Amino acid sequence: YYAQDFFDENKITVENQALGGMSSRTFYTRLWPDVRKGIQKGDWVIISIGHNDNGPYDSGRARASIPGIGKDTLNVTIKETGVKETVYTYGEYLRKYINDCRAVGANPILMSLTPRDAYDENGKIVRVNKTFGLWARQVAEQENVPFVDLNEISAAKLDKYGPWKEKYHFYTDHIHTSRFGAMMNARSAAEGIAESKDPKLALLQAM
């Protein structure tokens, strides 16, 4: 939400295709086919996903991806439905999004996850720079696409606010943000794009 507030509305239209509860796997299999139909040449596609990539592979919500960025696969049968599915790594799902965007001439951008309301032993917001953030960065480097460390940018802001202010940026589940948190993350994403040294973002930076 609110990303449109940080771009020139005369130059760019922002469409938010996110849906709560999706993982890199379930968004790709369930929602991406329709989203992909609307992507056109020259579009910019921001990909930031992974909060729900844990859990069971073959039961319940069955939305987990395999950790990492390798080429590992897992063939599963969903217990509740009997549907068979091949599960890929988190990084491989990111590559699928990237390849699909490039196939129609669109410009993918990878961003690390928005931070959770969780603290380390020093009272700082926990980063994902050893898991999903690292994997997104690695895939971006491998595929030569822009990467914005949204997790770090927003977490640094929350660290400055302190716990008494941070609580106003999240709901009680410690994951979903309030209006204030959503605005902060949108601003962080825009700042990450604006301050990037990646020449591939030069055109978007002008918008």
Label every model-predicted segment:
Residues 10-23:
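A short beta-strand-loop structural module common to alpha/beta enzyme folds
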Residues 11, 204-207:
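Short, conserved aromatic-histidine micro-motifs
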Residues 23-34:
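N-terminal post-signal-peptidase region of extra-cytosolic proteins
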